[in-house]
Amino acid sequence: MSVVEDVMVLGSDQPLRSIVRDEHLLLSPPHPPKVPVKLWEEHPPLTVVHYPQQYESEAFAPPRGVYENDEIRVEWQKLDGRQPFYHRNCDVDEISYQIGGERTLMSELGVIEFQPGDFSRIPRGVAHDNYGREDSHVLFYIPAPVTELAPAQRESGAVFPPFPGWQPGEANEAITQCMAALGHDITVFGVDEQLLLEQVHQEDRRMAVLRADPGQDVTRLYTTDRIRLGMVTTTPGGQRRYRRTLDADEIQYQAHGHRTLITQRGIVDLEPGDFVRIPLGISHASVATEPGDYVSLLSHRELPQVAETTRTADAYTPERLPSLTVEAR
């Protein structure tokens, strides 16, 4: 079967070029070499990391690192209650995507009440804390400054008290570098929590809450010269079309719906709560039989997995493709 592959680069939504491919050859191992020299490497299949979206109670634990290099860190966190300190980043903007539950973000730029599907960006140098109620969210630590590409749906506000039942008490503030990874605190000290939260009245800036446009296939939300972060909507129907990004790893988080990811590193069924990394230069397409969406992070630099693997992709077989008759981007 012939398919089209779009060759992409990080800074453009338009293909660098589009190529007609034989799908079987595209996904199959290469032909055996005709010389007695090893010409290419054996590469492992794609790996999936899964965290359940349904809240499961447990004692407070630090966020779980999922992917990380020396510039970017992707974490998954769940929270039921307060964090043990206020946090101020030295080097990164901190972007979150709300998976489920309720969460109050308290900061020097005001308070946000999150709903599932909300994105927000805490600018570098802004102190903040969270109060979760069976909450789960994904965190992206990205070198500042990050530019917002979508209009704000709402903004942080000067709310006091920040949530019902709040009482001022002993609080600490942690200053961190290296994307807030555990063990990279610079200094930790006591603060007057009420004084910290009242700083909002001295600030002109507010934090924007962004959401994906369900009417668009791709909603670009945040960008720098080295990353793009957005949301991709998948709908059944259409012809299968492949994408190969030449200069960026892609991290995908399956937010809603089920789909099958077909790649040159194997085929894997994805469900809500799955993370997967597609290395740069790997051709891939998605097949969906139900509506869904996923968060997409494109990173110009390799972004290795640091979490334990939940499962791996299956090797391509010609028998698998005939059942995959529905395409999604």
Language model region names:
Residues Y67-E71, C90, R133, T224-R226, ...:
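A generic fold-level signal
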Residues E108-A127, Q264-G281:
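Short acidic-glycine-tyrosine-enriched beta hairpin
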Residues R124-E155, E271-P272, L280-T309:
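Ligand-binding loop in jelly-roll beta-barrel domains
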Residues K78-L79, R88-S107, Y141-P143, T233-T234, ...:
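Short, conserved beta-strand element in jelly-roll/cupin
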Residues V3, R64-G65, R277-I278, S286-R329:
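Non-catalytic C-terminal interaction regions
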Residues Y55-E58, P63-W76, R82-F85, D91-V92, ...:
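Polyanion-binding and phosphate-handling cores
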Residues M1-W76, Q83-F85, E155-G230, R241, ...:
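A short, N-terminal "cap"/entry segment at the start of jelly-roll beta-barrel domains
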